[in-house]
């Protein structure tokens, strides 16, 4: 479930502030970039959110969406589902084992370069294009979960909670490994 590691090499896809060789990161005390981004996201266009656009369209019986409005609605639905998922997973983590690394404060890492390629593929679907691949030396605690439990977002809260329990209990479904790290990370190399 949770493993204590010392000076082990892992890789990270960094989408935040650019890192340099020798940087030392203390992970686990504050929100990570992923959670900070989704927690602070707002989708508003012309002082309207997606719900207001949909309400107006229904009132006017005009169900045609222009591309900008469609993108706004899509991003709102997707991000709302993601936030709901993360909050559910955090609630379940606290219930089952609060000593496991929080998805909200951890550093997501990969064990191999092949796993990095798989995650870059997943990232490409979210339009994250500006990133660094960094090689890290890690000392701390690491949890291995199966990310296939988190990839489907628009499911019932009940099903989401069941998936969260399976994830935090270390069950395997499709073996899409996801490593959650808290502790000290030293940047050994920048690979791109």
In which residue ranges do the predicted regions lie?
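Conserved NAD+-utilizing ADP-ribose enzyme module
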Residues: 2-9, 14-81, 102-105, 114-127, ...
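Hydrophobic alpha-helical segments, principally membrane-spanning helices and signal/leader peptides
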Residues: 79, 96-97
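Extracellular-facing segments of soluble proteins and assemblies that are Gly/Ser/Thr-biased and enriched
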Residues: 83, 90, 98-111
């Amino acid at each position: 479930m949770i493993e204590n590691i010392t000076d082990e090499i892992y890789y990270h896809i960094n989408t935040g502030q650019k890192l340099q060789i020798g940087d030392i990161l203390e992970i686990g005390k504050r929100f990570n970039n992923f959670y900070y981004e989704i927690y602070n996201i707002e989708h508003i266009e012309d002082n309207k959110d997606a719900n207001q656009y949909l309400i107006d369209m229904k009132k006017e019986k005009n169900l045609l969406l222009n591309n900008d409005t469609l993108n706004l609605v899509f991003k709102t639905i997707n991000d709302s589902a993601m936030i709901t998922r993360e909050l559910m997973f955090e609630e379940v983590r606290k219930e089952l084992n609060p000593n496991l690394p929080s998805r909200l404060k951890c550093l997501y890492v990969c064990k191999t370069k092949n796993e990095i390629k798989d995650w870059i593929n997943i990232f490409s679907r979210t339009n994250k294009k500006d990133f660094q691949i960094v090689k890290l030396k890690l000392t701390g605690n690491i949890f291995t979960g199966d990310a296939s439990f988190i990839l489907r977002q628009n499911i019932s809260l009940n099903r989401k909670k069941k998936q969260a329990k399976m994830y935090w209990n270390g069950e395997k479904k499709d073996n899409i490994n996801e490593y959650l790290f808290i502790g000290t990370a030293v940047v050994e190399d920048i690979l791109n």
